[in-house]
Amino acid sequence: DVVSPPVCGN
């Protein structure tokens, strides 16, 4: 899933 904050595990 694409989220605003770049988190590990898009």
UniProtKB/Swiss-Prot annotation:
Primary subcellular site in the record, as a coarse category: secreted
Tissue expression pattern: Expressed by the venom gland.
Any GO molecular function: metallopeptidase activity
Superkingdom as given in the UniProt entry: Eukaryota
GO biological process per UniProt: proteolysis
Names of the cofactor(s): Zn(2+)
EC identifiers of the protein: 3.4.24.-
Regulation of this protein's activity per its record: The proteinase activity is slightly enhanced by Ca(2+) and Mg(2+). Inhibited by EDTA and phenanthroline, but not by PMSF.
Keyword annotations of the record: Calcium, Cell adhesion impairing toxin, Disulfide bond, Glycoprotein, Hemostasis impairing toxin, Hydrolase, Metal-binding, Metalloprotease, Platelet aggregation inhibiting toxin, Protease, Secreted, Toxin, Zinc, Zymogen
Co-factor binding details: Binds 1 zinc ion per subunit.
Positions annotated to bind Ca(2+): V7, N10
The keyword Oxidoreductase belongs to this UniProt entry's keyword annotation: no
Record's comment on post-translational modification: N-glycosylated.
Top-level EC class: hydrolase
A Gene Ontology cellular-component term: extracellular region
Ranges for domain Disintegrin: 5-10
Assembly and interaction partners: Monomeric (57 kDa), and polymeric (180 kDa) forms have been detected under non-reducing conditions on SDS-PAGE, whereas only one monomeric form is observed under reducing conditions.
Family statement drawn from the similarity comment of this UniProt entry: Belongs to the venom metalloproteinase (M12B) family. P-III subfamily.
Miscellaneous information on this protein: Negative results: does not cleave glycoprotein VI (GP6), gelatin (an irreversibly hydrolyzed form of collagen), fibronectin, prothrombin, and gamma chain of fibrinogen. May not bind to alpha-2/beta-1 integrin (ITGA2/ITGB1).
Function: Zinc metalloprotease-disintegrin AAV1: snake venom zinc metalloprotease that binds to the platelet collagen receptor glycoprotein VI (GP6) thus inhibiting collagen- and convulxin- (a GP6 agonist) induced platelet aggregation and the tyrosine phosphorylation of intracellular signaling proteins (LAT, SYK, p76SLP76, PIK3C, and PLCG2) that follows GP6 activation. Interestingly, blocks platelet aggregation but does not affect shape change. Also degrades the Aalpha chain of fibrinogen (FGA), followed by the Bbeta chain (FGB).
Protein name (Swiss-Prot/TrEMBL): Zinc metalloproteinase-disintegrin-like AAV1
